[in-house]
Amino acid sequence: MAEFPKEFVWGAATAAYQIEGGATEGGKGLSIWDVFSHTPGCTYRGETGDVACDSYHRWKEDLALLQSMHLKAYRFSVAWTRIAPNGGTDWNEEGFAYYDTLVDALLEAGIEPYVTLYHWDLPQALEEKGGWRSEETARAFASYAAKMAEHFKGRVHQWFTFNEPACIVKMGYGTGEHAPGLKLPLEGQFTCWRNVIYAHCLAAQELRHADPENKVGFVSTGRICYPVSEAKTDVDAARVLTFACPDDDWAFTHTMALDPVCLGRWPEPDICGPRLAASIAAVPQYINDALPLGKPDMVGLNIYNAAPAQMGENGPSYVERPAGYAHTAMNWPVEPECLNWGPRQMQEQYGLPMFITENGLSCTDKVYRDGKVHDADRIDFLARYLEKLSEGIHAGADVRGYFQWSLLDNFEWHSGYRERFGLVYVDYATGQRIPKDSAFWYGEVAATNGQSI
């Protein structure tokens, strides 16, 4: 039986572009994902988030699903372009009205909103002025954060500024797999990275200035390595590989995201590749001076898998997985130890309260002849992962809550609607929601604080 702290938070997570739809309704402006998804060849089968799960119109159904699962927290993101259609300070009252209604309904239902301000949908108008290549975008984000904090004062206290800078920068400005689809060299990518970090620091100050009771968080994803044994040499080897920042794999590291915001400094040169180290050395002093001001109250960790590691003859090394190892429909390895060792490593490095802000898997779900969705693979996956999370907490990781990804099947970015991550099945032709077996299972987990696992 898994055991969790008495006040542990159980929730589910979504993101605006992935579920809302209503792409041109309510005064909303164009985001980079509106443009990118309509560009031929950029998404699976040319699919877009124009309608997605239609949560813009069907949010009451989503609220009922959260209630049915006994969840006390909902992590969702705000579409920046609903609030500021062109990314400036011409605020859109219709956008505020939509989120007012959602937030008020959540609070009335006893569900606390955990609001993410940026989950990848940059206003297209800002991208045309340089996007994350420009510090002006960081300043625009701070204005947006200030307005949100002012508007929702007394109602929203849990804020995450950014979701996964690794994906924002590496996939959007490096590989081009995500919006805006650029392929910049490392140096250009790092300029975007430092501007995202700068934006967080500026926004954190605005959120706290608006309401000292606000809690500010920052969500990271990246490489996790776990030791193949409890031997100190293997434990140390896994830690070295987790936090290393080589030039060929620097972005998908928690180090690059969390060192600047949690420790107030960039990663040390001895763990960085030479090009990355040179880019860090060239960061303007005023950005470095802002770093300590961005220290979060909580760290969000999006963790899905990990890599086994050991101390080899020539130093820390990865261990090859066995033939036929378990993997998800998205071909991600199934590695429950990630929720044990990942939080433990982050606790040792940063010493801050943590939330698992995303964890889950894509399955080849279908509606059976009985009209139900039987996703035994997801239940087994979540049970194994949550057992390991419990182990990590008992080993000293200060994890305060868990948000399953995701409440709904949704638009999975460049993969379109091919992948199904939800606890709830969505028929995209009709918008119908069908709770999967895992939704009922997870509801029992939340109701019993994990004792049913």
Where do the protein language model's features map onto the residues?
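Generic alpha-helix structural propensity
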Residues: 54-61, 69, 78, 94-101, ...
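A common structural microfeature
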Residues: 7-9, 56, 73
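Catalytic domains of carbohydrate-active enzymes, especially glycoside hydrolases
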Residues: 58-79, 293-299
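Glycine-rich, proline-tolerant flexible connector loops at the mouths of alpha/beta enzymes
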Residues: 78-91
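Aromatic- and Gly/Pro-rich amphipathic surface segment
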Residues: 30-64
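Active-site region of glycoside hydrolase catalytic domains
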Residues: 1-43, 86-88, 96-371, 377-453
